[in-house]
């Protein structure tokens, strides 16, 4: 199901994001996400520390858990043969496969589950699994669209 159109996107040293204008009138926005039988509310988030257990769901690898190994990581991609370093990312040992990027990453505290970011990349491969997964973290730039946005003022790239 198509829910909208991408009106702007950014891939820079601090951002890897897209802004979607909802155009499907049959799509209902919600601040609740159901992942692996866990309910994540978009109005809750949590700062994690090294050693914290995280959970992620990838399109290819499915449900995985792991441990945060760094809260101040960075990863360098090559875009148009130029290096681009993304900073302020979490590094975990949750295995990631190609196609997992964009998958939800969350943690648990008590009986509550909190969104902490999305899977973004990986560093080392071993038997088709990566040892380090980079998590684009919601902590410093958390923005939620609870209601459809009027994006008519945004410049199109």
Predicted regions and their residues:
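Serine endopeptidase catalytic core focused on the charge-relay Asp
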Residues: 1-80, 107-109, 120, 139, ...
């Amino acid at each position: 199901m198509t829910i909208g159109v991408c009106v702007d996107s950014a891939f820079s040293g601090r951002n890897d994001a897209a802004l979607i204008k909802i155009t499907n009138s049959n799509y209902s926005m919600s601040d609740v996400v159901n992942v692996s039988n866990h309910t994540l509310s978009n109005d809750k988030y949590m700062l994690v520390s090294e050693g914290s257990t995280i959970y992620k769901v990838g399109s290819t690898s499915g449900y995985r858990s792991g441990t945060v190994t760094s809260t101040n990581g960075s990863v360098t991609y090559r875009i148009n043969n130029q290096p681009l370093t993304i900073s302020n990312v979490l590094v975990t040992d949750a295995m990631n496969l190609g196609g997992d990027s964009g998958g939800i990453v969350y943690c648990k505290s008590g009986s509550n589950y909190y969104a902490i970011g999305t899977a973004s990349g990986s560093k080392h491969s071993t038997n088709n699994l990566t040892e380090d997964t980079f998590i684009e973290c919601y902590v410093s730039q958390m923005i939620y669209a609870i209601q459809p946005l009027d994006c008519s003022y945004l410049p199109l790239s």
